[in-house]
Amino acid sequence: MNYLAGVDEAGLGPILGPLVVGGVTMAGPEGTAPWRLLQSHVTKLKYKKGKVRVADSKKVKQGPHGFKRLEETALVFWTALHGEPPATLHEWLVALGHDLAPLQRCPWYENLDLELPRRADRDWICLTGELVARSLRQGGCELLDISVLAVDVEEWNVLIEDTDNKSKAHFHAYAEVLGHLLHGLFPRVGKDDACTLVADRCGGRMHYQMDLKRLCPDAFITVVEEIPGTSTYNLKQASRDITVTFAERAEDRAFPTALASCFAK
């Protein structure tokens, strides 16, 4: 079995907020390419009617119908994993494990009972989600986990106060999702399984070995390469190996990373 996971974030640009980190884990037979397996329902390079686009979220969200298409992508895959889309934003945040109290203290988040979807068609999402789930099953693949962490204003300000550094505060949030995926993968991965996690690179940061050691203190971590644009590490725990790569434009390299970017956006 091959395991493939991805992490990406949205919101940390010239104008911050809210910072959201997404993570996705999948499994399938060796050689499986998710974009090819799901080509009847999913497109990568451009939008096609009747399909959802899984790509860099900035590209998915382009144009006058961008929000609808982004919503379709996220809710279709949520439905593929959970059987149905969430009915409200409140329900979705609870399902993701969020503490709603800090959000409710922000006046711009006072209405968390917004119905979902906002612009997409719910029946179409339910149908397409089931078709995606069926295609995954027929290909021997499985969508294992979708994790989304939203860092509200209050939490971000605390992180900045604690670290006095925007980059460190950013990686602290990033590491929560990264660690969640890694801790979920280690018990699953067998000695004959391949496992790769591809994360979008955090700004100009090149070195992640010590950060990974803090996340996985029981793992032996070696540097495979640290070069401009890509940093790769091997994490070994007992007989289990996970390769973690931080790369520029990671959304173009790995399906789960592209899907994670859409959930974060």
Question: Where are these predicted regions, by residue range?
Answer:
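RNase H-like, Mg2+-dependent phosphodiesterase core
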Residues: 1-265
